[in-house]
C-alpha cells in the first residue's frame, strides 16, 4: 500500500463543549487541524479519502455531541475521521480560541491520533 498525508488546517466549526458552568449553554468556536494518512495506491478520488468529506466529518464530530474536555473532542474527531474509507491514520488537533483568550495565552489545543480500520 502506498500512502500520503493530507493536512487540512483551520477547519472552523462550533459546538457546546466545556467543563466550566455555562460553557455548554451557547455554541463556542472551535478550529480543527487534521493530519490524515490516506491510501493512495489507486491514484483516483474513489480509491482514497476525499478531503471535502474529511472536513465535513470533522465538523460533524464537533457539532454532534457535547463534551467536558477538549481532549475528548479531539478523540471524537480523530475517531470519526479514521473511520472514513481509505484512512490509515488520523490526527486531530482541536483549538478552543475562547480558552486561549481567557487564559492570556496564544493557544489552547488538544490532539488525538487514531489508527484507521
Predicted segments, located by residue:
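N-terminal, polar/charged subdomain of small-to-medium soluble alpha/beta proteins
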Residues: 1-117
Amino acid at each position: 500500500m502506498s500512502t500520503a498525508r493530507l493536512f487540512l488546517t483551520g477547519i472552523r466549526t462550533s459546538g457546546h463543549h466545556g467543563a466550566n458552568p455555562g460553557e455548554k449553554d451557547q455554541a463556542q468556536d472551535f478550529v480543527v487541524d487534521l493530519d490524515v494518512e490516506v491510501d493512495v495506491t489507486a491514484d483516483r478520488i474513489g480509491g482514497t479519502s476525499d478531503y471535502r468529506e474529511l472536513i465535513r466529518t470533522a465538523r460533524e464530530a464537533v457539532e454532534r455531541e457535547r463534551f467536558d474536555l477538549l481532549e475528548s473532542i479531539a478523540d471524537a474527531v480523530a475517531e470519526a475521521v479514521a473511520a472514513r474509507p481509505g484512512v490509515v491514520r488520523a490526527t486531530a488537533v482541536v483549538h478552543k480560541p475562547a480558552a486561549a483568550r481567557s487564559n492570556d495565552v496564544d493557544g489552547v489545543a488538544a490532539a488525538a491520533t487514531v489508527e484507521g480500520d
